[in-house]
């Protein structure tokens, strides 16, 4: 059932007449088994347990499938990375052929997605700049967003996928597997991802995988930001994160968002933002990726508009207007 602005009065009337009936809302995610599905499940549980609202995860085929339903108010919330809202807003790239999603609104930065480019540990490549001309996954026909993510990492060193020997793949998971099979020389990898752990185990005779460091300078950051808003960060070594050697590795991070639409009532979005902010520990306990949720940085500069209900809450806690990460 929908919780649109037009239906708010009738929903409240039903609540009063029926003993505060909960209005069931949806949060759209990628398919069951995906990272976004797990995160969406955690968010829906916290919101349902801590507010008068009932929120249920709704897995779909992918962002290009569920963004139109959010834009039209058919689903109240969803999870998107930092690039998808901008593409959907303009109707380009993986949203080409769809009307611009001008009703889309941002609600919260929910966690950071850490990623980097890895090579075999015994490979001769020591820096990203050393990768020019090597074999790398390309095209990402089923996951076009990843093309921009990979080029953003490479832009840190003044490179792009066009500087490489391109090996066409469907998605970045296939690219990681090709590194494990030594059919590419370097591949984009999610930090601590299950597939990265599998590839690392497969390459133990070569010492496993090794992430290449990004350069943390204003000039390098400027090159990255010409493609997408992403930032270098220092990842400390951990037994759960293969490829990060002693002393840590400077990798890339970018944001994942809770999104909604202009159809959804301000007080509903306010409640969701406030509840997520106040339950960081519960969220972190529910899924490892939500340990990267920072309640002190829930807003971020973006070309897509923020929902008024979210803005109201961020003004109350001193997070509006949003600031770029340091």
Predicted segments, located by residue:
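Sec/Tat signal peptide C-region and signal peptidase I cleavage site
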Residues: 16-22
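Periplasmic-binding protein-like
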Residues: 276-293
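Bilobed "Venus flytrap"/periplasmic-binding protein-like clamshell domains
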Residues: 24-50, 54-56, 113-181, 300, ...
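Ligand-binding pocket segment of bilobal, Venus flytrap-like solute-binding proteins
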Residues: 67, 76, 163-228, 311
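Bacterial N-terminal signal peptides that target proteins for export
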Residues: 1-10
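C-terminal lobe and pocket-closing loops
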Residues: 209-271, 313, 321, 325
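A structural signal for short loop-to-beta-strand junctions that line the ligand-binding cleft
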Residues: 97-110, 239-249
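Pocket-flanking alpha-helical
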Residues: 39-45, 58-98, 117, 173-178, ...
């Amino acid at each position: 059932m929908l919780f649109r602005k037009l239906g708010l009065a009738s929903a409240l009337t039903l609540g009063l007449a029926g003993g505060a009936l909960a209005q069931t809302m949806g949060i759209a995610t990628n398919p069951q088994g995906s990272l976004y599905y797990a995160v969406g499940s955690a968010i829906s549980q916290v919101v349902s347990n801590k507010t008068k609202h009932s929120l249920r995860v709704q897995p779909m085929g992918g962002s290009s499938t569920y963004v139109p339903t959010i834009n039209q108010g058919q689903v109240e919330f969803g999870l998107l990375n930092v690039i998808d809202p901008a593409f959907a807003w303009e109707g380009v790239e993986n949203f080409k052929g769809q009307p611009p999603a001008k009703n889309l609104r941002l609600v919260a930065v929910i966690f950071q997605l850490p990623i980097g480019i890895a090579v075999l540990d015994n490979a001769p490549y020591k820096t990203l700049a050393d990768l020019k001309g090597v074999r790398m996954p390309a095209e990402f026909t089923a996951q076009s967003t990843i093309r921009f993510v990979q080029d953003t990492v490479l832009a840190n060193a003044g490179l792009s996928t066009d500087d490489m020997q391109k090996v066409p793949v469907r998605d970045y998971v296939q690219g990681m597997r090709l590194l494990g099979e030594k059919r590419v020389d370097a591949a984009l990898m999610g930090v601590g991802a299950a597939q990265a752990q599998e590839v690392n185990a497969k390459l133990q005779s070569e010492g496993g995988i090794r992430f290449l460091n990004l350069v943390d300078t204003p000039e390098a950051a400027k090159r990255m930001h010409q493609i997408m808003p992403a930032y270098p960060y220092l990842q400390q070594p951990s037994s759960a994160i293969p490829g990060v050697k002693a002393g840590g590795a400077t990798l890339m991070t970018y944001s994942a968002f809770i999104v909604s639409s202009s159809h959804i009532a301000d007080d509903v979005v306010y409640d969701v933002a406030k509840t997520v902010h106040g339950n960081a520990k519960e969220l972190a306990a529910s899924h490892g990726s939500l340990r990267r949720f920072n309640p002190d940085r829930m807003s971020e500069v973006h070309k897509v508009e923020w929902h008024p209900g979210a803005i109201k809450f961020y003004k109350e806690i001193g997070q509006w207007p949003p600031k770029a990460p340091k």
